[in-house]
Amino acid sequence: PESKWPTAKLIEYKYDGARYQIHRDGDDVIIFNRKGVVVTQQFPDIVAKVTSYDISRFIIDTEVFPINGDGSPAKFSLMNSRFHSKDAQEGVRKCPVSLAIFDCLMYSGKGLLNTQLKDRMQFIEKFPDQAERVMNPDDTLSFYAKAISKGYEGIMIKDLNQVYKPKNRGWFKYKPPQINLDVVITGARYGDGKRSNVLASYDMAVSDSDGGFIDIGAIGTGFSDAQFLMLT
């Protein structure tokens, strides 16, 4: 409803990952999942990352998401390697991850739970590994297009005037509609870097009523290296 739409907005990428609250007090780090279960042992790489920060006492709200070798976002199903690996280092090898910090609940001993997001931002912005964001509503559509082109799920729209809520239902999510289409591959291009020897981008089209085709865009994500090689 329009009455619930925030007047002061912050727009961030929507990451296809898992939400974790990370507590650090000096060399001690604890990672909680959204059910409050301690999962620190699954993420030795994240522990190493946050203990490298100059800030030594904090509580942050984050999204941890799987990435491909080139740093692009991978399918969430890859996270099962983290959740179910008996050996943490094996999980790290099978499922490299990245961290996006989107909120701060405590900074150097200062509690921020009752502070509006627009005021928490001054603390959030002190951290590395922040979520990608814009605050100008005029940038929403271009930022959404950028998120999709980079392989992210879409965008989150948040109220800058809102205090912290653990199970926030006031955030708005915008993702591409999920529909099934019968498409035809009308062209293909070789990729860059490690994919320079395979066809890694495919032009897609749908048929029209005259028996021709209408281009609808290109796709280059969702395939494994073996699938790219097979299609080439």
Residue ranges of predicted features:
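Nucleic-acid 5′ end/cap handling module spanning
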Residues: 1-35, 89-96, 120, 125, ...
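Covalent nucleotidyltransferase
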Residues: 10-19, 23-127, 182, 198
